[in-house]
Design a protein with these regions (language model features):
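Mobile beta-alpha loop/short-helix "lid" or hinge segments that flank ligand
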Residues: 24, 71-76
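Conserved alpha-helical segments that form or flank metal/cofactor-binding pockets of metalloenzymes
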Residues: 34-73
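A structural signal for well-ordered alpha-helices, especially hydrophobic packing surfaces
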Residues: 13, 20, 27, 53, ...
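DHp/HisKA dimerization-phosphoacceptor four-helix bundle of two-component histidine kinases
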Residues: 11-14, 18, 44-51, 95-98, ...
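Disorder-to-helix initiation segments
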Residues: 1-12, 82, 89-92
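Acidic/histidine-rich alpha-helical segments that form the ligand environment
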Residues: 54, 58, 75-128
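Helix-loop segments that flank and shape redox-cofactor active sites
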Residues: 1-4, 19-44, 106-121
Length: 145
């Protein structure tokens, strides 16, 4: 078990969990002319993220380590800025673009750590997650144009 990979995966798990929660808050609090489309899009995103964090946590367990748990521990590990509950729809989308971008950096770090030690299963999982978040960033940025 590589501690470097575990540390990177724990960061990815914490940030994925935080992003799921933030996206859920956006789903609850979005308002304005784009309400229906964003409300639906945010729901799709947080549901996908909750499935993803489970896969990431299970990968950590498969590597022989413990997945991060407890809201306090996850909050301490997560490197994402909080979103204001009363953010405008545009600000919500901008925030989620930035948060997905931060998570993309974490995913690429974890992918690279896995590649260095020949852990192709973890590398594949990180590549799949990178593809999801790149698409999400593209879609959110398209909304802002």
């Amino acid at each position: 078990m590589s501690e470097k990979i575990i540390t990177a995966l724990r960061q990815v798990a914490a940030d994925t969990y935080a992003l799921a929660g933030q996206t859920h808050i956006c789903h609850w609090n979005v308002r304005g002319p784009s309400f229906f489309s964003l409300h639906t899009a945010f729901e799709q995103q947080y549901n996908e993220l909750f499935v993803a964090v489970d896969e990431i946590a299970e990968r950590i367990r498969a590597k022989g380590a413990f997945a991060p748990g407890g809201l306090g521990n996850l909050a301490q590990l997560a490197g994402l800025e909080e979103i204001a509950e009363d953010a405008s729809a545009q600000d919500m989308v901008r925030h989620l673009v930035a948060a997905n971008g931060k998570l993309l950096n974490d995913l690429k770090t974890a992918r690279d750590c896995a590649g260095e030690v020949g852990d192709s299963e973890t590398e594949d999982l990180m590549i799949a997650r990178i593809q999801v978040h790149e698409k999400t960033v593209w879609m959110l940025n398209s909304f802002l144009e």
